[in-house]
Amino acid sequence: MRVLFIIAVLALISVGCYASEMKDRSSRNEVLSAIFAIEEPQERDCLGLFWICNYMDDKCCPGYKCERSSPWCKIDIWG
């Protein structure tokens, strides 16, 4: 009788842990999907940081600049 009680208690603990793990896993999946949804590339008319550019027609986004010596968009320190 005692053995059956111990097996029943262990089964209940196992089911409780499994349910808790599934709830935690679904929460993690929601957080990860939200993070990756934010990082999807957006279409824009300007080039972002470290994008290859042409200094003749500087299409870098505001705050970045393209120079002849380094043909990629970088932060414009001097404004």
From Swiss-Prot:
Similarity annotation: Belongs to the neurotoxin 10 (Hwtx-1) family. 35 (Jztx-27) subfamily.
UniProt-listed InterPro entries: Huwentoxin-1
GO cellular component terms, A-Z: extracellular region
Sites of Tryptophan amide modification: W78
Signal peptide: 1-19
Tissue specificity statement from the Swiss-Prot or TrEMBL entry: Expressed by the venom gland.
Keyword Transferase: no
Domain notes: The presence of a 'disulfide through disulfide knot' structurally defines this protein as a knottin.
Any GO MF annotation of the entry: toxin activity
Swiss-Prot/TrEMBL keywords: Amidation, Disulfide bond, Ion channel impairing toxin, Knottin, Secreted, Signal, Toxin
Keyword Disulfide bond attached: yes
Protein known as: U24-theraphotoxin-Cg1a
Species assigned in the record: Chilobrachys guangxiensis (Chinese earth tiger tarantula)
Organism domain of life: Eukaryota
One protein family per Pfam: Toxin_12
Prosequence residues removed at maturation: 20-44
Major location category of this protein: secreted
Subcellular location: Secreted
Role played: Probable ion channel inhibitor.
Annotated disulfide bonds: C46-C61, C53-C66, C60-C73
